A protein has these predicted regions:
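Conserved acidic
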Residues: 39-42, 94, 98
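Elongated alpha-helical scaffolds
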Residues: 96-105, 109
Length: 136
């Protein structure tokens, strides 16, 4: 028997995580331009790139997806199918891991590279997402 859960991620949650994680960077680096609402289109583009990478890695589990980047309702809804009964907290844990992964991917591409603190955090949360999906 397969079990299905839906993961709903609001893009505002991702942007808030980006702003929160990225606030110290301009203070630490005088040449950094900072992430704010004026450069939101760049941030949205980076989030989409990270989401494409993450979805490719999760493709074996995803049975449906509705990615909506419209102005009125900006959210991501993923239907995930698992072979074993999921824990009650799995949808929330996956959402949190994906939000953190996408925020750090965005910051990695804006401020650093794979070896930066953001690159390390991106890999950590990406792995956490996949482990949450594959755990018994």
């Amino acid at each position: 028997m397969n079990y299905r859960i839906d993961i709903v991620i609001d893009l505002d949650d991702i942007q808030q995580a980006i702003y929160t994680e990225g606030t110290w960077h301009p203070a630490d680096n005088a040449t950094a331009w900072g992430v704010n609402h004026s450069n939101e289109p760049i941030v949205d583009r980076r989030v989409r790139e990270g989401l494409d990478d993450l979805l490719a890695r999760m493709s074996g589990y995803i049975v449906s997806q509705n990615i909506n980047f419209n102005i009125d309702s900006q959210n991501i809804v993923l239907g995930v199918e698992l072979r074993k009964r999921p824990l009650l907290s799995l949808a929330r844990d996956l959402k949190n891991a994906m939000v953190s992964a996408l925020a750090n991917y965005t910051l990695m591409t804006l401020y650093g590279d794979e070896d930066s603190i953001y690159g390390t955090a991106w890999r950590l949360h990406r792995a956490r997402t996949l482990l949450l999906l594959s755990r018994p």
